[in-house]
């Protein structure tokens, strides 16, 4: 079948509808496939399939929400809503690379354990720790500020996501890499 969609959402809805139609005609999910050219196209398609309750698996690629760059964005958003999420904080404290090394991360983690506080709160102590290099303290401070800005941002979710991506420098860092893979990751984030 050929269908001229008005946008990617319309395309995803149509595909999910076609799958549902064929399923109701007796076709097994195992006998259906959807091909797409770029990984960036899978996001909307996966979203529509999930909404329609259609089981799927990705062959030769990674599910959209399992991609590192998407998990990074999700970790930032998690911290905006729940700054006590240590797993999310440790995932993105140095994403993109901002000069916060393993030793500093371990030190922050140790502060948190010793003082029974979340990683992000402990990171605020690192900002004033004279035993940590000034450039690293500044980088930790910038990371904390991104999360605080996100938490106080009074816009709709799309604007919050855009602000976090911009302030964290996620797209800028990938654009600076200049590789085809990095360009694909930028498409995924956008």
Name every feature range the model reports, one short phrase each.
Residues 1-36, 61, 89-90, 123-132, ...:
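Inter-lobe coupling/hinge region of RecA-like P-loop helicase motors
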């Amino acid at each position: 079948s050929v269908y001229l969609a008005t946008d990617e959402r319309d395309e995803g809805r149509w595909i999910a509808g076609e799958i549902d139609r064929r399923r109701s005609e007796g076709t097994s999910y195992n006998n259906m496939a959807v091909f797409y050219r770029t990984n960036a196209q899978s996001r909307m398609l996966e979203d529509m399939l999930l909404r329609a309750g259609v089981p799927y698996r990705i062959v030769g690629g990674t599910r959209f929400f399992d991609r590192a760059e998407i998990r990074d964005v999700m970790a930032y958003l998690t911290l905006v809503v729940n700054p006590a999420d240590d797993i999310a904080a440790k995932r993105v404290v140095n994403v993109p690379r901002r000069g916060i090394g393993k030793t500093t991360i371990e030190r922050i983690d140790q502060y948190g354990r010793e003082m029974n506080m979340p990683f992000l709160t402990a990171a605020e102590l690192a900002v004033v720790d004279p035993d940590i290099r000034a450039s690293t303290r500044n980088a930790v401070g910038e990371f904390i500020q991104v999360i605080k800005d996100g938490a106080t941002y009074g816009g709709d979710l799309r604007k919050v996501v855009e602000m976090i991506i911009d302030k964290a420098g996620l797209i800028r860092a990938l654009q600076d890499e200049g590789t085809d893979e990095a360009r694909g990751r930028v498409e995924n984030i956008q």
